[in-house]
Design a protein with these regions (language model features):
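Extended beta-strand/beta-hairpin segments
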Residues: 1-43, 54-133
Length: 133
């Protein structure tokens, strides 16, 4: 990943090996135009696990109307401030959801497949919850 500072700003452009660009940094006070590095970490955790869950459920032939993940975290009080507790809530929407298969898919992601989840466990207590809607 190549990261370039956008001169005169608090923004950086990150370009991944495929050439896809993402702007990260901090916005001017009162504006929330771009994602912070820590918010991107939480998003990466959710996407990593979400990709696993969707792929596993597809193989299990589980149909969903919708699926979302809410990720919240607490920061330490002292610098360097980092996430010391993270909660990942998996929200599943649909009729006659197969809870057993859904729970198995989430468990496989959390315990076996999601590398970002494993990285987070190195510095944070990670809790997961499953919600059915």
């Amino acid at each position: 990943v190549i990261t370039n500072w956008k001169k005169g700003t608090t923004e950086f452009e990150c370009i991944n090996p495929n050439g896809v660009s993402t702007i990260l940094g901090t916005s001017a006070e009162g504006e929330e135009k771009i994602a912070s590095p820590k918010a991107i970490m939480l998003g990466s955790l959710a996407v990593c696990s979400g990709l696993d869950v969707v792929a596993i459920l597809k193989k299990m032939r589980v149909e969903l109307d919708d699926f979302k993940i809410n990720t919240t975290a607490s920061l330490t009080d002292e610098h360097p401030r980092f996430y010391n507790e993270v909660t990942v809530e998996y929200h599943f929407f649909g009729q006659d959801l197969d809870k057993e298969k859904i729970e198995k898919a989430v468990d496989l992601s959390v315990t076996r497949y999601c590398g970002v989840m494993e990285m987070f466990r190195g510095f944070s207590k990670v809790k997961t919850e499953i919600k059915y809607n």
